[in-house]
């Protein structure tokens, strides 16, 4: 377990919109950038464009288009700017097969090809039910169906999907949050038997049509009721483990570090069943305001705390070795509410208004944390003169010791832009020319030479500005940055 150390182009016509992109300025982002860490600024992290040829650990959500909760064409032009390698789509059985046996994939073709055109690999969550099969009397929204006419129709549909997108879609995820669906016995959280059967039958069809594509199971959020364990053991009993490449999880806790122990337990479970199966964070994100529905509702979020939360969650997953997908690219209009999880804020007409601070934060992550970066398990925090918990892990680049990521944790991210000046000592890392990278602003700061001391065991740094948002201390020659200030 990672140690939590206790130490101390329609929108352009709208009034007030400016900029070449036709987007409003983000007032919050301007305030964040106007109050950087109290250190000299040397430049900014160099961002990367999404590129099919470049490996990536990061994904962004492009979900709910199967239900028209967003308009793909209104935001696809911004997706490549994020630098992510992947994007999650939902397949929309009901939108594709409106008459039994008649498939219209034009809408999904547009999204798959659009992402590829932006340099992003699409991965596809196969879901949900289809009302044209409702004559069985089964709930065909997110409910999981047993063997029978619905399953037969579903498997035919899946075969058509996989056959059509072979060579384009990199991974199929079977269903979304099945632990939220009521099973035949009506007890929420006990749908694992029905789900396991659905997964195995679906995965067999996927593998028949595309032997090389990856397959992910579960996309579940329930860590406390044995859902993952019960499902994987049932999948194993049904002979489905050879089809399982990933187990995806969703996590929405106001204090993101609470996920660490659960993910480590899930990784251990997967390893005990088949070490080949890896854990992937498939959907997590933070609202930008107090929401009255959906995940992490009834909490006073802002665009400040949102950006910090998403950065912490991304860095936690990196430290755990989990590729990660951020929910979601834009605010989603459910009709009864307009969600605020988006990297881009949208209006009620699903038109983009401005890039939230979260957008720029994710650009900083994708620009730095490429597959050349890995966790350095030899680095640890040995002393700190503060009285709040710290999350700390070391990083390597191309196998060489590079630096450390650290932030103050233990509480929900705040709206404050204040940093605390802290003295720390790190063991297992001897930094010769380190710089300070603010993962939120992207500013690369100089560390005063007199404040950095290399010891036999590691490195000590005096008066280091720290806060409840990730900071990267890294060797200068291992970070790519511009001279922009």
Region annotations inferred by a language model:
Residues 135-246, 250-269, 290-310, 429:
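Active-site cleft segment of glycoside hydrolase catalytic domains centered on the general acid/base Glu
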Residues 425-445:
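Solvent-exposed beta-hairpin/edge-strand motifs
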Residues 22-160, 173, 179:
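N-terminal substrate-binding region of glycoside hydrolase catalytic domains
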Residues 56-62, 87-89, 122-126, 170-174, ...:
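Hydrophobic faces of well-ordered beta-strands that scaffold small-molecule active sites
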Residues 286-369, 376-389:
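Aromatic/acidic polysaccharide-binding cleft in carbohydrate-active enzymes
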Residues 4-13:
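Sec-dependent N-terminal signal peptides
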Residues 446-485:
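C-terminal beta-strand-rich structural cap/linker in extracellular carbohydrate-active enzymes
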Residues 382-430, 470-472, 478:
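Carbohydrate-binding surface patches
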């Amino acid at each position: 377990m990672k140690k939590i150390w206790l130490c101390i182009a329609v929108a352009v016509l709208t009034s007030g919109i400016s900029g070449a992109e036709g987007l409003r300025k983000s007032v919050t982002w301007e305030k964040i950038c106007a109050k950087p860490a109290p250190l000299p600024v040397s430049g900014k992290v160099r961002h990367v464009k999404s590129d099919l040829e470049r490996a990536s650990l990061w994904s962004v959500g492009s979900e709910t288009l199967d239900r028209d909760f967003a308009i793909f064409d209104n935001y696809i032009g911004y997706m490549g700017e994020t630098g992510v390698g992947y994007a999650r789509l939902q397949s929309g059985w009901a939108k594709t097969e409106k008459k039994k046996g008649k498939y219209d994939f034009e809408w999904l073709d547009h999204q798959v090809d659009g992402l590829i055109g932006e340099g992003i690999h699409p991965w596809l969550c196969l879901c949900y039910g289809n009302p044209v099969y409702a004559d069985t009397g089964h709930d065909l929204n997110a409910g999981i169906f047993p063997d029978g006419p619905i399953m037969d129709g579903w498997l035919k549909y899946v075969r058509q999907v996989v056959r059509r997108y072979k060579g384009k879609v990199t991974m199929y995820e079977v269903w979304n949050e099945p632990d939220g669906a009521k099973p035949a016995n009506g007890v929420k959280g006990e749908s694992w038997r029905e789900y396991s059967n659905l997964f195995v039958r679906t995965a067999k069809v996927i593998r028949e049509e595309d032997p090389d594509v990856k397959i992910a199971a579960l996309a579940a959020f329930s860590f406390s009721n044995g859902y993952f364990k019960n499902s994987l053991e049932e999948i194993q009993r049904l002979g489905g483990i050879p089809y399982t490449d990933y187990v995806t999880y969703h996590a929405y806790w106001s204090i993101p570090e609470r996920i660490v122990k659960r993910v480590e337990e899930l990784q251990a479970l997967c390893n005990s069943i088949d070490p080949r199966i890896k854990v992937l964070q498939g959907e997590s994100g933070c609202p930008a305001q107090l929401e009255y529905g959906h995940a992490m509702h009834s909490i006073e979020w802002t665009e400040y705390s949102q950006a910090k939360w998403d950065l912490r969650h991304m860095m936690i997953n990196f430290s755990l070795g989990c590729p990660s997908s951020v929910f979601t690219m834009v605010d989603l209009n459910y009709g009864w509410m307009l969600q605020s999880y988006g990297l881009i804020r949208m209006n009620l007409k699903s038109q983009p208004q401005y890039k939230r601070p979260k957008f720029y934060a994710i650009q900083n992550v994708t620009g730095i944390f490429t597959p050349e970066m890995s966790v350095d398990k030899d680095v640890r925090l040995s002393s700190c003169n503060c009285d709040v918990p710290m999350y700390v892990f070391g990083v390597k680049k191309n196998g060489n010791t590079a630096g450390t990521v650290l932030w103050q944790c233990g509480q929900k991210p705040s709206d404050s832009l204040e940093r605390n000046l802290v003295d720390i000592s790190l063991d297992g890392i001897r930094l010769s020319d380190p710089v300070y990278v603010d993962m939120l602003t992207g500013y690369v700061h100089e560390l005063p030479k007199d404040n950095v001391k290399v010891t036999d065991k590691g490195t000590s740094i005096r008066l280091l500005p720290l806060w409840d948002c990730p900071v990267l201390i890294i060797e200068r020659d291992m970070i790519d940055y511009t001279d922009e200030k």
